[in-house]
Amino acid sequence: MAAAQHRPVMLEEAVRALAPSGGDVVVDATFGGGGHSARVLRELGPGGRVVGIDRDPEARGRAERLLGDPRFSFEQGPYDEVLWRMVGRGERADALLFDLGLSSFQVDDPRRGFSYTREGPLDMRMDPGSGPSAADFLNAAGEAEIAGVLSEYGDVPRAQARRVAREILRRRPLRTTADLREAVRAAVGWAPRGGNPAKRVFQAVRIRVNDELGGLRRALEAAERLLVPGGRLVVISFHSGEDRLVKRFIAEREGRCTCPPELPVCVCGARPVFRRGPVLRPSEREVAENPRSAPARMRVAFRTAEPAREAS
């Protein structure tokens, strides 16, 4: 199989928001193909440092080309766990990037089971050696749980989600991506417009299998402690659930006063932990050149000197 080509999304916009310079420490929490890390290293001085993190064991091989640079290091594991280990070691960072979702390496490899267009084992784990696979989940969960996952994580209409869940139960055990794709086809058909419903189903199952939203929340709470005052948080998301979580996290930490309007002074003690930055979308040119970038949304926030909120 030809090697997949991964193009980092919103590369220049992300690097401008990260604003790396001099001796900064920059954490690339979703290393992927290393495009963002390589670009940041070009901007740093000899005393700077980039820490790359990726849950996918195959990412370590892609990091080899950068490991010859003494300013670069790589840690393999879920980003929330790695970031909290860094917090425990007393480390700090000047900028931190999350480029969420899948890399082209993962989507285009049928052995990983992420794509409904490529037949392979029904796996979908970011780390194939860790935790239950998509097949394990779908072959064990009840109808209500499966339908809830499809609605919550894939924005599948509830009636459709129930039909798909019933069809999955009827066809169990599911073993391949084709098994799941055909269950979706039998349950709701293929719409000529509006996108293939299998795309949302596969997305929802993947998010559930990898606990992506839970991991993101824990990682953002770690980032809150890692970033120095003035530190830059940059998050590129591709799914409405991810974006809502990031937006809510930043809003909760903007320190907006909740006192009744009739009070002359603030007594609620609200203090901003982050200042909200810009929200950006990919340019028309980037979307034309790389259609996978179309749903991307980039949120930026700046750390203040206020103490971190209590972790959930």
UniProtKB/Swiss-Prot annotation:
Enzyme class per UniProt: transferase
GO molecular function: rRNA (cytosine-N4-)-methyltransferase activity
GO terms under cellular component: cytoplasm
One Pfam family cited in the UniProt record for this chain: Methyltransf_5
Residues that, per the record, bind S-adenosyl-L-methionine: G34, G35, H36, D54, L83, D99, Q106
Reactions catalysed according to its record: cytidine(1402) in 16S rRNA + S-adenosyl-L-methionine = N(4)-methylcytidine(1402) in 16S rRNA + S-adenosyl-L-homocysteine + H(+)
Coiled-coil portions: none
Xref: SUPFAM superfamilies: Putative methyltransferase TM0872, insert domain (SSF81799), S-adenosyl-L-methionine-dependent methyltransferases (SSF53335)
GO terms classed as biological process: rRNA base methylation
Keywords, in A-Z order: Cytoplasm, Methyltransferase, rRNA processing, S-adenosyl-L-methionine, Transferase
InterPro entries given in the database record: RsmH (IPR002903), SAM-dep_MeTrfase_MraW_recog (IPR023397), SAM-dependent_MTases_sf (IPR029063)
Record's keyword annotation contains rRNA-binding: no
CDD domains per UniProt: AdoMet_MTases
Keyword Cytoplasm: yes
EC annotation from Swiss-Prot or TrEMBL: 2.1.1.199
Compartment(s) of residence: Cytoplasm
Function: Specifically methylates the N4 position of cytidine in position 1402 (C1402) of 16S rRNA.
Family note: Belongs to the methyltransferase superfamily. RsmH family.
The protein, known as: Ribosomal RNA small subunit methyltransferase H
Source species of the chain: Rubrobacter xylanophilus (strain DSM 9941 / JCM 11954 / NBRC 16129 / PRD-1)
